[in-house]
Each structure stands twice: as C-alpha cells, then as structure tokens.
C-alpha cells in the first residue's frame, strides 16, 4: 500500500513556489549607480546617485497572518434542512423542467416548511441554492423554529444527486464541494468547501457559503451534505422510509402520475404542495432519527455518510484500544520528519502502514479472496413438489467472530494438505480433480462470467474449502500454501456483534432502529474486502474515474477467511443433500431444494465450525439452516433468476428477476416473470433504461434523467454447468423443457460452451426438444471442428456439414470414391433428392477446398446421412468423415440396421 503525504500540502501552504528566493539581481546592481553619459567622461560629482540596496540580504518576507480556527457548532446542535424538488421531463427530452423546490427546516424537534416556485420551468428560470436557503431559514425564524441565523447547517435529501443539481449554476458552484458515492452524492469533507484539486495540482482554500438575508445582512453558512438514501436500510425508497417513520407519503391522485406532475400542479396546487412538502419532511425526520440513533445509541460525535460508515464507527467504539485498533488489521505506525518552507523547525507526521510481513503475502491473500457462491443447478420448470428456500442465519456476521489478530511474522509455508485444515487462516494455490460423479464440487475458479465450480482445475482458496474438497474425495496438489497463525484468541468483532444483537432485541421487530441495526451489522464485514478487486468510481472534482480507496478495515487475509468459510459451508451442505433430492440454485448464503431440513446432514466439520461461531453471539440460537420461503412449483432460469409458478400458502412468492426490470405498477411480478419466460422469443427486447451516469452529468452538465434504451432479453441458462436429461414439464397449461445439470470438467470446457451458446441464443431460445436438438447439434459440431481447418456456416446443421465435406472427398476422389462412379450433375441431383439441395457447380468447385478428415460429429442426423451414403456408395469409407472417438459407435449404429 503506497502512503503519500499530499494531505500536508492542503493544510500547510507547502509548494515548490515557496522554495524560490527573491534577492538582488545583476540588473539591479548596474542600475543602482545611475547611467553614464557617453559624450564625455563623468565625474563622481556629476553622477546621480541612487539608494543602494544592502548586499547579501534578502528582503523581509511579509509575515503571514494565521487564520484563526473557527469554532464550529457541535454537530448535534445544528439545524437540519431537507430539500426536495419536483420536476418533469422537458418535451425535447434533454433536461428537466423544475416545478418546485421545497424545504423542511428541523431544529430541536420543531419543524418549518416552505415551497418555492421558479418563475419559469426552463433552465434559465431555476432558483439558486443560496437564495433558497435564505428564504427557508428566514421562514424558520418567522415560525420560531430558529431564534438566530445558524453558521453550521446540515443539508440533506433522499437521493441528493437528483435534487442538488436542479439549482441554478449548481455544477459550477457545487462540483468541487461534493463527491460521488454509491452513484449518489455526499460531502467530501466535514463541511461544504473545497479540497486539493487533483487535476490542477494546486491548493484551493476551503470557502464557506456567503449569503445575504432580506435586509442585505451578510451571513456565512458552513454546510454538510447528506444523502439520506445512503442512511436507509437496504437503500429503501422514500415511501418505505416514510412507512417506517409512520409518516405516509402522499399519494398522487388519478389520473395524474409522477411523469405528469405539471398537470397535477396546475389542477390541484394545494394537493401538489402537500405531496411535495411531505417528501422533504420525511427526509428531515429520517435524518433526525439516524442522528438520534448515532448520538444516543452509538455515542458517536457525528453522523457518518453511509450505514457502512456508521458500522465502522460503532465497531471502533466497541474496542478497548480505540486509537490503536488498526494494529489488529496488520498496520503499524510510522513517523517521518518533513520540513515545510514556512516553518522554522521540522514537522513530525505519523501514518498507519501495513507491517512488512503482511505486505509480503498481501497479493497472495487477495487472490484467495472471492465472492459468494451463486449457481443455478437446473434450467426450466420444476415438478410440482414442496420447494424450500433455506438460509444460513447471520452467515457473514457470525463468521467474522472467527477473526483474531494475525501473527504475520510467524506465517509459514507448508506442503502438508492436512496442515491447512481446521480453524486457521490458511491460504493455498492448488491443482484439484474431483471424482466424476461429484454433483457439487466445492472449489471455485474465477472466470469472466463469475465463479464456476468445475471438476478439475487450479485455484487460490482457503483451508476451509480444501477441507470440504478433501472430504468429497478430491485429488489435491499444493503448488503453494501458507498458514498465518492467530496471535491470540481474542475475537476482534465479538463485542460489536454481541452488542448489535442485544440492541436489535431491544427494538421492536421491523422498526426503523431494528432494521438500521441489522444492516449495520451485516455491512461491517463488507468493509474487509473494500477495494481488494479494482473498482472505479467517477471522481466529480477530478473529472475522471479512479479506483475506489480501501476502507480502514480492509484486510485481504480477513476477507479471504470470511468468504472462504461461507463458500465452504454452502459446499458442505450441498454435498450432504441426498442424491434423490433436487437442488434448484444456491445464492451466497442459502439454497432452494425439495429436501426437508432433517434430510440434510449438518454435522460436518465446517457446519460444526460455523455452529460454534454462530452460538457465540446467540447461545440459544437454533440450527445453522432455517426455512425462509416455500413454493410448490418454480422456474429456475439461470443464476439469480428464479420465479414462483405455484405459491405455497402462508409464504411470499420466491422471486429473483435476474436483472430484468419490471414496471413497479405490475402487482404480481412473479406471475409477470413466469409469463415473460414462457412466451419469450429470439430477439425479444426489454427495458434497459438507466439513469444519467455521473460522468456524463458532470462533464456535459446534464440533468439526472432516465436515459431510455431497449436491450436484448436474456433469460437463457448461463452455462456455468453442463445441461443434460431434457424432459417436457407442464407449466400453467404450457409445456416447457426442463433440464438437469452436471459440473463442467474444466474452466476451458465452460468457456468453450458459453461462447458458442451466446452466439446460438441470438437467433434461438431453449424452450422445447427441437430447440434442445438444435443447440446440442451446434455444440457437438463446434467440438468436432474446433481443431480442424473448417468454418461452420450460420445455422448449419451437423448433417449439412457432413454433406459439404463429403463433396470434397468425391471431388478429390479419396476414401473409395471415383468420378467414374457418378458424374457431378448426377451426384448433385441425388444429394438434392435426399434433402440436401446441391448444384453441379458446387460439386465441381469442391475440388478447390482441402480435404478434412474426422470433423463430423456423431448425431442422429449424421448417422442417417451416413446410411444413405453407404447405400449409394458402398465402397466409400464413411468413417473417415467422423472424429476418431465416435467411429466404433458409428459402426455399431450402421450395423444395427
């Protein structure tokens, strides 16, 4: 990890310009004696003397007056101002027409609201943020919510990015004050100001916002921006937050809608104002609730910008050593002396840097970090049965209880496989091969399509996963392996998790505080892996994308341990499901199956390891697997795409849409997805509209709009496993193909299949037996010709390929064929008669093509054509056309009839 000291320049005025000195120059020395007259010698008396500067002395520098540090208003004593805007898309579709700006000022529980209307809905008629804030604050003072002008305020909105830049000149005034965060906007520092501009490489001083009230008195505002969407559980909508806070969002009456708000304003201005102001009230009350939670429940000094940030702060507060906690994550403090040009003595700075031993293995640990296991094990509908959706309770939260401080200096290499087993931080690079009958291999291989789980290959993984693979009978060869021992048995996250569990129990289930605490606990482990894999975000100030920086908790060893144990746990559970039971899919920490809970063996070593961790935070906790949902019939389309066909009474439908957007007005979205799947056709398109990205908005000064587009619908299987055993299943009166799967032999096999399936599905869908035969025919053709010098034609079938190659053998008189047997015209007529339209010119021109042997796959189509050819040309060695592996089977098929 590279540590820089650029921060120093921001706060010390240190720059290369300060190193230049201004002294007495040579030209000044000459001019100091005056100018000699060229016409006659000059005497000393005639010389006009000038004051001579003191030699070898620099002019005195003006003493810089240090700006006094401003005493800020304590965070929880600042007024909260929530902003919301209502707008509709312009007729030309290039900008938003702003209809109104509404503000809610909240201070010490008292509330003041105001709605402001622009003179025009054109861009030129937009109101400026500073003018709006003045009116909102003055209205709050009139309403006796504020008794004086504030200096520090909190400005918030639900989805701040959508509202903040609807003000006049917002891009020029605000782009250096805020930064993109999870595709929205939050403050870049504690207050509204400017920081070091990375593009111009120069310092920009922080500047507050200066405003004038109606009496022309000047006031200075220091603003901290918050996006309350980043502080809502699961990024909930404003309506959902309103329900949690018991502030219902005003419904838009028919026939109006969110896209016809201008008509709503014109027809019912009072109802429009109520609707608009309520949105700002919900946002203000939401921030008030989060603020109270941070102050009273977590004892924080301020409100972090995201729930993940709240989790980190709460976690640090749960530790005994709050100042040196980064030592638990493999950091040490390093001091360095620097000497700024404007100081009379050196300055000592301290930074946290990774310890040397951690850096030695950091890249290896990062390679061992992967995400969750996500696979579909079927393609198509299930039979009618009882299909259960099981989840591992508090999966990642419980696993973090296994994390202890690592003794990086004592890490060691090993070639002993069993040395990697057990509750250790063990990392390995291995080659593996599972037995052929293995249903669910447990070692992940990374690909451009995500993680796949083949029967053989090589991968970086953890000791937990190797333990499961070994118990499945896999042959494992260690290429490199390391064990990093625990320094002690103190569980880093245990106090935090126990505290969070107790807090959740103290709140009403389903309440705002309970949901917020739950997400806070679940988001903490995600910080362990932040920025381990390159991920860019658009930097608003710099104007380009740059890699997301690590969090203070980022640690590749902990991230690998946590996700590796989760994958191992799911792998062991899947392996212990009886062979006569079907598994539909697995998603991160749960799976869909028709097996009952008592039929799944949960006594394996990994299950026991997780059980011990889970019961550390909940000693009275139940089993390590629990039922969440249930259905009678499902469709498993692909990874993360499962739809409920027939529901089970008392359960919500199981639905994962697999990136397909459904109009929110559709009430039964599961039924919609089922119908969409059953009626799909090649070339179908779905809505692929997206919101204007930050890059486009800030570089082109565009409004946040819905960029409309259509994309090709993709509901086909993702080929992460090999399809087999097709049957037709009835689904709501329609028949649809259903397929089982088995693991691919290798990553290469999966990539080979996926590439060709993606090409095939451009003009096909997999819905019935004809589709299945078409796809299988195309796949075996690709396999047979992959190392041959032959190019497949579009929509060419295996028998058409065989006919094309057969003509070459005739033209070259090879394999027992002779032109004396039959003329080209006669052969063309015969080929046409048996169903392969051929011209005599094609027969003759086949001489120009090279002979290719062993390129024809064995299919029903090619066997039938082989019989016809042999009956016409008994001396022809038809086997020469087929790949060598299938020739014995071909002879059996030809002799069987």
What are these language model-derived features?
Residues 57-79, 144-148, 214-216, 366-388, ...:
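A short acidic-Thr-Gly-centered motif at the start of a beta-strand
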Residues 74-106:
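Gly/Thr-rich phosphate-binding beta-strand-loop-beta motif of the actin/hexokinase/Hsp70
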Residues 231, 237-341, 570, 589:
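Acidic, Mg2+-coordinating catalytic module of metal-dependent nucleases/exonucleases
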Residues 111-259, 275-278, 282:
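Conserved DEDDh/DEDDy metal-dependent 3′-5′ exonuclease domain
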Residues 279, 389-394, 521, 580-596:
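Catalytic palm active-site di-aspartate
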Residues 2-81, 85:
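N-terminal accessory regions of nucleic-acid-interacting proteins
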Residues 291-379, 438, 463-467, 477-576, ...:
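C-terminal, non-catalytic extensions of nucleic-acid polymerases
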Residues 228, 234-235, 374-534:
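Catalytic nucleotidyl-transfer cores of nucleotide-processing enzymes
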């Amino acid at each position: 990890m590279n540590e820089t000291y650029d921060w120093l320049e921001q706060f010390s005025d240190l720059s290369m310009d300060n190193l230049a000195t201004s002294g007495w120059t040579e030209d000044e020395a000459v001019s100091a004696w005056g100018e000699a007259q060229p016409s006659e010698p000059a005497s000393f008396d005639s010389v006009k003397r000038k004051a001579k500067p003191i030699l070898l002395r620099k002019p005195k520098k003006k003493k810089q007056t240090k700006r006094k540090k401003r005493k800020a208003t304590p965070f929880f004593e600042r007024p909260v101002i929530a902003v919301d805007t209502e707008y509709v898309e312009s007729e030309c579709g290039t900008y938003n027409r702003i209809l109104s700006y509404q503000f809610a000022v909240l201070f010490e529980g008292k509330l003041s609201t105001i709605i402001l209307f622009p003179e025009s809905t054109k861009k030129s008629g937009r109101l400026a943020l500073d003018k709006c804030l003045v009116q909102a604050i003055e209205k709050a003072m009139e309403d006796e919510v504020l008794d004086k002008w504030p200096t520090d305020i909190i400005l918030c909105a639900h989805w701040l990015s959508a509202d903040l830049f609807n003000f006049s000149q917002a891009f020029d005034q605000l782009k250096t004050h805020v930064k993109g965060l999870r595709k929205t906007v939050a403050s870049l520092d504690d207050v509204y100001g400017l920081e070091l501009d990375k593009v111009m490489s120069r310092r920009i001083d922080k500047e507050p916002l200066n405003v004038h009230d109606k009496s022309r008195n000047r006031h200075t505002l220091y603003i901290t921006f918050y996006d309350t969407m980043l502080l809502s559980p699961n990024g909930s909508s404003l309506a959902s937050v309103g329900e949690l806070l018991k502030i219902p969002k005003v419904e838009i009456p028919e026939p109006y809608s969110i896209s016809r708000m201008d008509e709503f304003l014109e027809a019912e201005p009072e109802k429009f104002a109520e609707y608009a102001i309520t949105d700002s009230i919900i946002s203000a009350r939401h921030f008030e609730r989060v603020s109270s939670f941070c102050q009273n429940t977590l004892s924080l000094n301020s409100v972090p910008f995201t729930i993940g940030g709240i989790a980190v702060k709460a976690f640090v507060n749960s530790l005994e050593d709050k100042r040196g906690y980064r030592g638990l994550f493999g950091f040490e403090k390093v001091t360095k002396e620097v000497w700024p040009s404007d100081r009379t003595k050196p300055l000592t700075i301290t930074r946290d840097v990774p310890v040397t031993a951690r850096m030695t293995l950091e890249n290896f640990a990062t390679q061992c970090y992967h995400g969750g296991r996500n696979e579909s094990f079927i393609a198509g509908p299930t039979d009618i049965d009882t299909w259960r959706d099981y989840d591992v309770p508090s999966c990642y939260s419980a696993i973090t209880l296994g994390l202890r401080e690592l003794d990086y200096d004592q890490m060691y290499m090993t070639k002993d496989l069993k040395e990697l087993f057990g509750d250790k931080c063990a990392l390995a690079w291995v080659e593996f091969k599972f037995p052929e009958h293995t249903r669910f291999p447990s070692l992940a291989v990374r690909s451009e399509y995500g993680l796949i789980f083949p029967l053989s290959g090589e991968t970086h993984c953890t000791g937990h996963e190797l333990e499961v693979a070994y118990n499945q009978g896999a042959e494992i060869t260690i290429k490199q392996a390391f064990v990093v021992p625990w320094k002690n048995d103190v569980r880093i996250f245990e106090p935090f998790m126990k505290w969070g569990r107790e807090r959740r129990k103290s709140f009403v289930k389903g309440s705002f505080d309970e949901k917020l605490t739950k997400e806070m606990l679940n988001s903490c482990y995600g910080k362990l892996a932040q920025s381990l894999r390159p991920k860019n975000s658009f930097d608003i100030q710099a104007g380009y994308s740059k890699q997301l920086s690590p969090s203070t908790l980022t640690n590749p060893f902990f991230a690998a341990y946590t996700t590796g144990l989760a994958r191992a746990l799911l792998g062991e559970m899947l392996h212990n499901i009886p062979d006569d039971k079907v598994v539909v899919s697995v998603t991160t920490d749960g799976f869909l199956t028709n097996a009952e809970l008592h039929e799944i063996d949960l006594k394996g070593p990994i299950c026991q390891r997780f059980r011990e961790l889970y019961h550390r935070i909940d000693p009275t906790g139940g089993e390590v697997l629990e039922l969440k949902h249930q259905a009678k019939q499902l469709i498993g389309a692909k990874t993360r795409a499962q739809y409920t066909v027939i529901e089970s009474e008392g359960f919500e439908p199981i639905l994962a849409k697999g990136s397909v957007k459904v109009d929110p007005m559709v009430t039964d979205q599961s039924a919609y997805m089922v119908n969409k799947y059953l009626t799909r056709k090649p070339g179908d398109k779905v809505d692929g509209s997206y919101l204007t990205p930050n890059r486009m908005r800030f570089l082109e000064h565009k409004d946040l709009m819905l960029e409309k587009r259509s994309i090709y619908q993709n509901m086909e299987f993702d080929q992460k496993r090999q399809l087999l055993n097709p049957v037709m299943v009835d689904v709501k009166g329609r028949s649809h193909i259903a397929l089982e799967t088995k693991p691919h032999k290798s990553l290469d096999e999966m990539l080979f299949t996926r590439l060709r399936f993606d090409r095939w599905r451009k003009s096909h869908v997999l819905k019935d037996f004809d589709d299945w035969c078409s796809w299988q025919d195309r796949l075996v053709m690709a396999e047979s010709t992959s190392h041959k010098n032959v190019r497949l034609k579009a929509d060419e079938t295996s028998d058409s390929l065989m006919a094309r190659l057969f003509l070459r053998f005739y033209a070259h008189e090879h394999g027992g064929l002779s032109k004396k047997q039959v003329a080209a015209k006669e052969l063309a007529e015969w080929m046409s008669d048996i169903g392969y339209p051929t011209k005599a010119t094609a027969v003759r021109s086949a001489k120009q093509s090279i002979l290719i042997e062993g390129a024809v796959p064995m299919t029903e189509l090619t066997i039938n054509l082989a019989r016809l050819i042999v009956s016409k040309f008994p001396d022809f060695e038809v086997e020469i056309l087929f790949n060598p592996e299938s020739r014995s089977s071909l002879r059996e098929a030809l002799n069987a009839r």
